[in-house]
């Protein structure tokens, strides 16, 4: 894998099955070695941020957003133990509500598990695109720290009818810029629902200072070297 990346760095294509290869004479061997070492170190020693959440310890990979900004990737997908634990702890401090709503996609397992543990028969999902089965749609725009361009969220008008006059709890895995929250709030308000509260597993960056957000743990932002931003 490392050798393949080295060849790709110098503009070569690596063909599986080939037993030999050669580098052009104009490529400096010393530079090739340096690049090879850098690739190896990057693959073997990926920066991580170790944290405890809902009584569980997890190592979050630190990922590049811009040249000066890195974030820790919190992925709840596939982690059943973490999903169950986070849902349990959020429900302990949740305000009174009638329904939960979340945005596609990372908030889905959390909302589902919170609904299951609380005995709710239904929760609402704001989709990234309109679906054929929708009777109609409400929409709002969103741009998060991890999305390169503006996205839209869509709510089925059939769900909107059920939300009217009800207390709606907005739930997500991580809140950072708050753009996702604003988009969900717009959908709830448009449907005539009453915002009961806003909850997340983690509050990232400036979101940690929000007084209207209930969360389990703080998630810092990072410098390129993996240190926490001051």
Predicted segments, located by residue:
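Active-site-facing substrate-recognition patch
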Residues: 43-97
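PRPP-dependent phosphoribosyltransferase catalytic core
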Residues: 44-50, 182-230
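Aromatic (phenylalanine/tyrosine) cluster motif
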Residues: 9-15, 21, 40, 45
């Amino acid at each position: 894998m490392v050798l393949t990346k080295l060849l790709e760095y110098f503009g070569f294509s690596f063909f599986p099955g080939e037993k030999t290869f050669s580098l052009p004479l104009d490529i400096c061997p010393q530079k090739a070695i340096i690049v090879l070492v850098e690739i190896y170190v990057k693959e073997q020693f990926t920066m991580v941020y170790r944290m405890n959440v809902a009584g569980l310890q997890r190592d979050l990979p630190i990922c590049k957003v811009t040249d000066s900004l890195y974030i820790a990737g919190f992925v709840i997908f596939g982690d059943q133990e973490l999903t169950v634990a986070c849902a349990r702890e959020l429900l302990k401090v949740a305000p009174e509500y009638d329904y939960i709503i979340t945005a596609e996609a990372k908030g889905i397992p959390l909302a589902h598990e919170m609904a299951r543990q609380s005995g709710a028969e239904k929760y609402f999902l704001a989709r990234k695109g309109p679906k054929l089965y929708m009777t109609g749609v409400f929409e709002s725009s969103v741009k998060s720290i991890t999305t390169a361009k503006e996205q839209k969220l869509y709510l089925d008008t059939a769900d909107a009818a059920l939300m009217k006059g009800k207390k709606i709890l907005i739930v997500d895995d991580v809140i950072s810029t708050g753009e996702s929250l604003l988009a969900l709030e717009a959908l709830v308000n448009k449907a005539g629902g009453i915002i009961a509260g806003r909850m997340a597993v983690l509050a990232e960056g400036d979101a940690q200072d929000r007084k209207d957000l209930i969360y389990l743990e703080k998630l810092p932002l990072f410098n390129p070297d993996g240190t926490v931003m001051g």
